[in-house]
Amino acid sequence: MSLLQFSGLFVVWLLCTLFIATLTWFEFRRVRFNFNVFFSLLFLLTFFFGFPLTSVLVFRFDVGVAPPEILLQALLSAGCFYAVYYVTYKTRLRKRVADVPRRPLFTMNRVETNLTWMILMGIALVSVGIFFMHNGFLLFRLNSYSQIFSSEVSGVALKRFFYFFIPAMLVVYFLRQDSKAWLFFLVSTVAFGLLTYMIVGGTRANIIIAFAIFLFIGIIRGWISLWMLAAAGVLGIVGMFWLALKRYGMNVSGDEAFYTFLYLTRDTFSPWENLALLLQNYDNIDFQGLAPIVRDFYVFIPSWLWPGRPSMVLNSANYFTWEVLNNHSGLAISPTLIGSLVVMGGALFIPLGAIVVGLIIKWFDWLYELGNRETNRYKAAILHSFCFGAIFNMIVLAREGLDSFVSRVVFFIVVFGACLMIAKLLYWLFESAGLIHKRTKSSLRTQVEG
C-alpha cells in the first residue's frame, strides 16, 4: 500500500467515523443510553477501530493486507450499512398515540422475581459444575486454544448456559439500583467470568460483557463520566490482551510484543479485515441464502434427539473459515455482520440486513423504554435484565453475523422465558401450600421495632 492510497483510505475512514460518531453523540446527549447508542458504538468498534491498527501493522511491520480498493469497499459498505440502519431505526412505523391503559401481558411480584434470578443463577452454576467435573481446568490442561473445540472436551453444549449468570445478577442489581449493588454486580460477574475463563480454556466473553454492562450502567446513573469510560476502555483492551497471551501461551517482548498487541487487539475488537477478505473473494462465494440461519440452530439440538445431526454446521462463520480462507484448524473466524450478509446474499443483502438490524434494535429499545415506564419495580427489573442480558447477543450480531445472532437470541428468549414460567409455577405451588405470607405494613413495623 502506497502512502497516497493510504491517504485516500484515511479520508474515507475519517468521514465514516465522524458520521457515525456524530450521530451517536447526538443520541447520547438526548437519551444518555439506549440500545441504538450501544449498537452504534459496537459498530464503530467492529468496523472502524481496526483501521489505525492495520495501518501501523502495514507501515511498521510490513504486514500484507487486502488490496486498497478492497479495503475501500469494506469501509464504504460499513458506512452505507450504518446510514440505512440509522434511517430505519429513526423511521416511525406508526403514529404516536396517547398512552391508553392496557392489560399487561404479565406481571411480577417479589417472590417470583427472586425465584427467577435464583433459577437463572442455578442454571449457570450447575452447568459450570458439570462441565468442570467432566473436564477440569482446561486452561491448564490443553496445549492450544483450538483444542477446546475438539473431541477431547466433553459437555461443550453446557457452555451456552454459563452466560445466564449475568442476567441473574442484573435482576439483583435492578431490584436495588444503588452503588453497592452496582459494585457487587461487577465483582460477582467478573469473578464468575474469570472462573469460566480457566474452566473453558480461554473464553473471555463473560468478562468482556460483564465489564461493558457495568460501565453502561455507570454512565446511565451518572456514576462514571465519559473520560472514566475512555480510561476503562483502555484498561479493558490491555486486560483482554493479557488474557489472550495467557490463552495462547505466548511470551513476547519488545517489537514482537507491540506487533502481537496490534494484531490481537484488532482481531479481538475489530475484525474488519475479515470483511475485506470476503469482498476480495466475492466472485468465488456460493451465496447461501437464509440457510446459515437455519443451520445455526443445529447446535442447539442434542444428538440424542437428532441422531443424524451434522457434526459440522455450515453457518456463515464456518463457510468463511472453510470455503473462503481454507482454514481447517478447528477455530471459526468471525465474518462480521456485513460479512455474514455477503455470504448469504451478496451486496444486495447488505441494505436489506441493515433494515432488519434497525428493526431489531428498535424492538430492544421499545422493551427498554417499557421497563423505564413500568411502575411495578419487580417487572421493571425483569425487563431491564432481559434487555441488558441480550447485550451478548448484540456483540454476536456485530462480530459473528445475523445467523449466529438469530439462533442465540431465540435460545436466550426461550431459556429466560422458561425461567419466568418456572418461577411463576413455583410461586403458585408455594402459595397453594400456604408457604407464602403477604407482607403488611404492621408486620414490617414490628420487624423494624424488634
From Swiss-Prot:
Principal location listed in the UniProt entry: membrane
Nuclease in keyword set: no
Pathway: Bacterial outer membrane biogenesis; enterobacterial common antigen biosynthesis
InterPro entries tied to this protein: WzyE
Key words, A-Z: Cell inner membrane, Cell membrane, Membrane, Transmembrane, Transmembrane helix
Annotated TM spans: 6-26, 37-57, 63-83, 119-139, 155-175, 181-201, 207-227, 228-248, 341-361, 378-398, 410-430
Cellular localization per UniProt: Cell inner membrane
One GO term (biological process): enterobacterial common antigen biosynthetic process
GO cellular component terms, semicolon-separated: plasma membrane
Membrane topology: Multi-pass membrane protein
Keyword Calcium found: no
Pfam families listed in its UniProt record: WzyE (PF06899)
Subunit note: Probably part of a complex composed of WzxE, WzyE and WzzE.
Family assignment from sequence similarity: Belongs to the WzyE family.
Its biological purpose: Probably involved in the polymerization of enterobacterial common antigen (ECA) trisaccharide repeat units.
Name the record gives this protein: Probable ECA polymerase
Organism: Shigella dysenteriae serotype 1 (strain Sd197)
Source lineage: Bacteria, Pseudomonadati, Pseudomonadota, Gammaproteobacteria, Enterobacterales
